[in-house]
Amino acid sequence: AHYHSFGHALIYIPKAAELIHYLGEGVAPPVLLCLVRSIVTGFREDLIPEFSHYGDALSGFGQGQNGRPPSLEAFAGLNPAKAMALTAEHGSAPPAELYASLLAVNAQNMLTFDLRHLQDIDQPYGSDRGWLDFSHGLTFADAVYSLCTRYPELWPAGLLQMACFAGRNAGYDDSDVILEDWMVSDPQTFFQEITAMLMDHGQSEYIVSVHLLKTVQAVKRLYALPQVGAASQIALAALNRLLSSSVRRKMVRRTARQAMHFIRQDT
């Protein structure tokens, strides 16, 4: 029930099952060994200061009387602690409705990401932001839906961890970015063209090509969920903007300054 490995553990579990299903039982031992090793050695993010309120929020989840999900605007500017507290207060709302609300928040954060933050060079480790920080919120949301609809008892943990992502990525928005500019008029054609592009992506780093692939597939599944309502449109628009923007990977000055700052802490 804790926040494990920045959400990667939850993402890997259904994907490992899918991989074994497609490739056959013969690949099960190495795939499962890798999965178990990653779970055993993964970090508990609920123990770091940024997410330290997770345990309390999980304990108090659903004890409030508010049975309606908070609006998208209610999450605006909330840090992880406040985003989790708001989610827990509304924990008696139907899980699917609360999920749609949190998906909309994470999708909105990604859609409105201020690209000027890609040029930040004086930020300490962990505080700089890039596209992968935001796309991870959607791929994690996809995994939450996959597992929590199968194991409903996991909804509180999954929803609160979505709130962690929402709060962590708050405050990096560009107010000039609006939904209408990035809405996709023909989703079916859009996904067909993007899938074809992914087969000839031209990316030199596997981490970029793989993240693009899993984000496209996650948004495709999320868009097909009728119960998430307008959140699906926001997620699709966010993906459209991501694919229309460059994914800068080399941050030489940022890396150098972060390294010097890190070393100075020990001198």
Please describe what each predicted stretch is.
Residues A1-T267:
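Mature, well-folded catalytic/scaffold domains that follow N-terminal targeting or propeptide regions
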